[in-house]
């Protein structure tokens, strides 16, 4: 699956996708990314598309650390995806890791809207978390 960075001409589509998720989070909205950008964060809006519509997405925030020590990478209240669709989740997470690594992220924090369970813990460990 191909993961693309979403440009501003798809802002409404991004917000509609985020708003219709079972666990909508303001922190995955376009405006939240704009706010964080003003606070010195670099914003990447990454999405998996199928048949010209977003099926999984993550607003990845990157903040440089002082002294050129790398950066931190953070996806507040996301990624947003159907975690049972393993191929989709794997593709999105691979691109997230690639972008974070490109910014020399010393860690990547995600906050997927999942209930804490041994099944979800096992799944996330299997995906590299």
Located regions from the model:
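Conserved donor-binding loop and adjoining core beta-sheet/short helix segment
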Residues: 33-113
